[in-house]
């Protein structure tokens, strides 16, 4: 039974990757909006870089969620 508590804590820590991804994506979006406001002609390039970065940041959140679900439901 002691292992169940440790698994719950590990799953909670893994689920917190969503917070980091959210903060990272919001900071990147803010800087992209600033960049587009300063140089509207570079909007396409900035938007492409933003989408690539946001996808990579969101992938870490998805991996964290998968790890948390595996820990909770499979009780490794």
Curated annotation (Swiss-Prot):
UniProt key word Mitochondrion? no
Matching InterPro entries, A to Z? ATP_synth_csu_bac/chlpt, ATP_synth_F0_csu, ATP_synth_F0_csu_DDCD_BS, ATP_synth_F0_csu_sf, ATPase_proteolipid_c-like_dom, F/V-ATP_Csub_sf
Q: Which GO terms describe its cellular component?
A: plasma membrane; proton-transporting ATP synthase complex; proton-transporting two-sector ATPase complex, proton-transporting domain
Task: Name the domain of life this protein comes from.
Answer: Bacteria
Q: Which molecular-function annotation in GO is an example for this chain?
A: proton-transporting ATP synthase activity, rotational mechanism
**Which parts of the chain span the membrane according to its record?**
5-25, 54-74
Kindly indicate whether the keyword Ribonucleoprotein belongs to this entry: no
Q: Where is this site: Reversibly protonated during proton transport?
A: 58
Q: What's its membrane topology?
A: Multi-pass membrane protein
Q: Which UniProt keywords apply?
A: ATP synthesis, Cell membrane, CF(0), Hydrogen ion transport, Ion transport, Lipid-binding, Membrane, Transmembrane, Transmembrane helix, Transport
Protein localization: Cell membrane
One Pfam family from the record: ATP-synt_C
Q: Which family does it belong to?
A: Belongs to the ATPase C chain family.
How does this polypeptide assemble, per the annotation? F-type ATPases have 2 components, F(1) - the catalytic core - and F(0) - the membrane proton channel. F(1) has five subunits: alpha(3), beta(3), gamma(1), delta(1), epsilon(1). F(0) has three main subunits: a(1), b(2) and c(10-14). The alpha and beta chains form an alternating ring which encloses part of the gamma chain. F(1) is attached to F(0) by a central stalk formed by the gamma and epsilon chains, while a peripheral stalk is formed by the delta and b chains.
Its biological purpose: F(1)F(0) ATP synthase produces ATP from ADP in the presence of a proton or sodium gradient. F-type ATPases consist of two structural domains, F(1) containing the extramembraneous catalytic core and F(0) containing the membrane proton channel, linked together by a central stalk and a peripheral stalk. During catalysis, ATP synthesis in the catalytic domain of F(1) is coupled via a rotary mechanism of the central stalk subunits to proton translocation.
> Protein name, please?
ATP synthase subunit c
By which gene is this protein encoded?
Answer: atpE
């Amino acid at each position: 039974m002691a292992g169940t508590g440790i698994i719950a804590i590990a799953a909670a820590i893994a689920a917190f990757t969503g917070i980091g991804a959210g903060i990272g994506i919001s900071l990147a979006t803010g800087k992209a909006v600033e960049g587009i406001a300063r140089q509207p002609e570079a909007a396409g390039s900035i938007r492409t870089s933003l989408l690539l970065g946001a996808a990579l940041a969101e992938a870490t959140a998805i991996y964290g969620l998968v790890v948390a679900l595996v820990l909770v439901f499979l009780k490794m």
